[in-house]
Regions:
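Beta-alpha junction/loop-to-helix N-cap segments that form part of ligand/metal-binding clefts
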Residues: 35, 48-55, 68-140, 211-218, ...
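Extracytoplasmic ligand/sensor domains, especially the bilobed periplasmic-binding protein
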Residues: 102-207, 257-284
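Sec/Tat signal peptide C-region and signal peptidase I cleavage site
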Residues: 23-30
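Solvent-exposed, acidic/polar segments of extracytosolic/periplasmic ligand-binding ectodomains
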Residues: 34, 353-422
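Extracellular/periplasmic periplasmic-binding protein-like sensory domains
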Residues: 150-153, 249-327, 338, 393-394, ...
């Protein structure tokens, strides 16, 4: 009898130890951070935007952690510099998934840096949220990809459509167009839309060329474009090319009715300060500016926080262009995690596909290929710029929204005259 009692006591002791170990394991896991991995352009041609996006993501992390994290666990960002170089991306994401074993992945900044990460996400069956990628999923059709870009379900056309709408509303309507694009993924996708829209609207393309990344001098290109005397000049370019093309256009006195369209980088505060009045007359895309028509709940508080931190880390002091969307991208991810109470990739993807999200850049829902259900591409024009001062660029009156109508704050000034007008 005593032997039996002793046996039960030993079994009970073992059970208590096992339960204790189990509880300790659960507690230890609860203390482990949820890791979100990504590459980001911290050096190279996209670094001005990439570093501002990183600050926005760190603000989101700090905000979430101050409220207890996600699923009761702190959030940790695991990131590497992709150097604005697509060739670095596959290795970065392979390391994040296979070595770092992060819980979730999101993209770095821009189409050229998202596209090479897609095969890694797909082969590992991972949820993947892209930041400012134009039509990245149009070839893959991957059901776990979602795009933080207001280009809607038909992004290739939606991106350039507002430029055409603004130009075609003019009297007389433009008849000819010059198209210049960088030889890279984003400009390629944008150019396809431009060609289609030109054909649909009976506009003759009189110049259609690409240029290699790193082109040092755009003056010969501007001269070749001017020789065709186009009514419209659409440029699809990344920041170094945008800066080079605008410099050549102003120095050469390019004359056309409408110039711009798809020039990435002109939205950066540093570029605005660099060119000042030379931006006058350029018609370009944007995604958000603090116009009265676009002050969504929470965004001004975010910008106040961002702008207070920006000087210390040397990033874009205004933060209008990319930071709100970098923050909103993680808002979507975080809300999905909390709603599903899970890190399961399938459950998260199903939830994001089937639910709307309230973010600082407005209400968002996702449709086919993970694109926004509705496009919201802004067409703006720089007007009345008198100097290169930062304070001047805080006034949205010099950057009126021309389209879409529900956000419109001004009307176009034409023709473009090498930056001398506006």
């Amino acid at each position: 009898m005593h032997r039996k009692t002793g046996g039960w006591r030993r079994l009970l002791a073992v059970a208590v130890v096992c339960v204790g170990c189990s509880l300790m394991s659960v507690a230890a896991r609860a203390a482990e951070p949820i890791t979100i991995g990504f590459g980001m352009a911290l050096t190279g041609g996209l670094a001005a935007a990439g570093k501002s996006a990183l600050l926005a993501m760190q603000i989101w992390r700090d905000t979430v952690n101050a409220k207890g994290g996600l699923l009761g666990r702190p959030v940790k960002l695991v990131f590497y510099d992709d150097q604005s170089n697509p060739a670095t991306v596959p290795e970065i994401y392979t390391k994040l998934v296979d070595v770092d074993k992060v819980d979730l992945i999101v993209s770095g900044y821009g189409t050229n840096l998202i596209a090479p990460a897609m095969p890694i996400a797909i082969s590992h069956d991972r949820l993947f949220l892209g930041l400012f990628g134009l039509a990245v999923n149009s070839e893959f059709h991957y059901p776990k990809y979602f795009s933080m870009l207001p280009a809607g379900p038909d992004p290739k056309h939606a991106f350039s459509e507002p430029f055409f709408k603004v130009a075609l509303a003019a009297d007389p309507k433009p008849k000819t167009l010059a198209l210049l694009a960088e030889d890279a993924e984003f400009p390629k996708n944008a150019s396809e839309g431009v060609r289609d829209l030109a054909k649909q609207n009976g506009i003759k393309i009189v110049y259609d060329r690409t240029y290699p990344p790193g082109t040092p001098d755009f003056t010969p290109i501007v001269h070749a474009i001017q020789a065709t005397n186009p009514d419209m000049v659409f440029v699809a370019s990344y920041p170094p090319g945008s800066v080079g093309m605008l410099r050549a256009a102003t120095e050469s006195g390019l004359k056309t009715r409408f110039f711009g369209g798809g020039m990435v980088g002109l939205q950066y505060t540093s570029v605005k300060e660099q060119f000042g009045p030379k931006l006058n007359g350029v018609v370009d895309y944007d995604w958000w500016i603090p116009a009265p028509t676009m002050q969504f709940p929470g965004i001004l508080d975010f910008l106040k926080n961002y702008q207070a931190k920006a000087p210390a880390v040397g990033v874009d002091p205004l933060g209008w262009y990319l930071p709100p969307f970098a923050y909103a991208n993680l808002q979507v991810l975080g809300d999905a995690v909390e709603a599903t109470k899970s890190l399961d990739q399938d459950k998260l993807a199903d939830y994001i596909h089937s639910h709307p999200f309230k973010t600082i850049v407005g209400d968002i829902s996702f449709g086919s290929d993970g694109e926004w259900s509705k496009a919201r591409v802004l067409e703006i024009q720089w007007q009345g710029i008198k100097s290169n001062s930062l304070d001047q660029f805080k006034d949205t009156k010099i950057e009126p929204i021309l389209d879409p109508p529900e956000y419109k704050t001004g009307t176009v000034i034409a023709p473009y005259n090498g930056g001398a007008g506006g």
